[in-house]
Amino acid sequence: MLMKMIADLHIHSRFSMATSKEGTPENLDFWARKKGISLIGTGDFTHPVWREELKERLVSEGNGLYRLRDEYVKEESRKFPGEGTRFVVSGEISSIYKKNGKTRKVHNVILLPSLEAADAMAQRLEKIGNIHSDGRPILGLDSHDLLEMMLDVCPEGILIPAHIWTPHFSVLGAKSGFDSVEECFEELAPYIHALETGLSSDPAMNWRISKLDRYQLVSNSDAHSPSKLGREANLLDIDCSYEGLYRAIQTGEGLEGTVEFFPEEGKYHFDGHRKCGVSLSPVEAEQLGGICPVCGKKLTMGVDHRVEQLADRAEGFVKKDGKKYESLVPLPEVISTCMGYSTASKKVQGCFEQLIQTLGTEFDILRNVPSEDIKSCAGERIAEGIENVRTGNVKRIPGYDGEYGKIELFDEN
């Protein structure tokens, strides 16, 4: 039976570097329910301690997906409607290696149909390098060889190049990536069926490169804490099983579209130099020869510029069979902008909780709940802020060189 669901497949547990200690199975389940996400990746399957925790706390549904054992479900999770969160085994590998005379740094996400397959994969990876200290292990393993290994260990596995445009750690990144997926994966490139667009690009930017036409475009949060789940996600209408997910990612059947950041909000949209506070469009950066006008050092090339380099279609090109996508701003950010307090403040958090308790999940509020209902619960300004996000009537100040961009919901002039 087909089931409409929101899926976030690339996330991290507390065992990855620079992550929240809140990243436990129970907290991930709680936040997924709160946000209205039906399916999440486990993240970090390579980490032995995390894998043992997953075996203890998750139970298999017999179809390649898992759910939290009932005794671990938090009391406050039970108030949300639906059947609870499904988990799919997932992890990310950071590959750093030399190829064709250059140092390459590429992140790849792997999805697997079972924790047993994760055991087998981890066993092989452990022979390459240290998988104990970081949930996203850094290995001197060519992406091609990683894919070859996965296909050997588990032919039903899925490898998705992660946030493909990020300057420093991605397959097409300006700093240490390649100029094509084929150059990276060589004769195994036909086994790559999907690409993760990352926070700083959206599907429309990717449509400009005809070589990417054959790939499904997926979006995930890459969340380093449970509250960041669903910053980006996939809209699915699939049989609720690993097989259904596999078909959606590998063929597009049942992949209805994605939920996106406004790409300008991503940390690497424009060219720039964070230390000097310099942010430049691709045209401006070209005029300066890619050099920072303040300190004279090389600028970090942003995603917008890198797409421009590889594009063979004009800006604004719409792919005929391109999937729909919606650009959203996380609800706490909307409330924060409307109230003038930080997202962590008691006032913003109180309003967020009130909206969730009264109107439903975060995705429902951002996407579906009528403006009038939002207005009567949280006031006119927040209702208007959400409406502006829905219609794209926002001002975008692009992020650059690791600095998040800003989305302004109101024209205050």
Regions found by a protein language model. Name each.
Residues 335, 340-413:
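Low-complexity, acidic/Ser/Thr- and charged residue-rich accessory regions of DNA metabolism proteins
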Residues 10-14, 163, 224:
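Histidine-centered divalent metal-coordination motifs
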Residues 17-20, 51-55, 169-176, 207, ...:
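Histidine/acidic-residue-rich catalytic or RNA/ligand-binding cores of hydrolases
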Residues 256-326:
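Cys/His-rich short segments
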Residues 1-95, 100-103, 394-395, 404-409:
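An N-terminally biased module of ancient metal coordination in phosphate/nucleic-acid-related enzymes
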Residues 10, 44, 87, 110, ...:
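Divalent metal-coordination and catalytic microenvironments
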Residues 4, 52-193:
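Extended substrate/RNA-proximal surfaces in nucleic-acid metabolism proteins
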Residues 214-230:
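Short acidic/histidine-rich active-site segments
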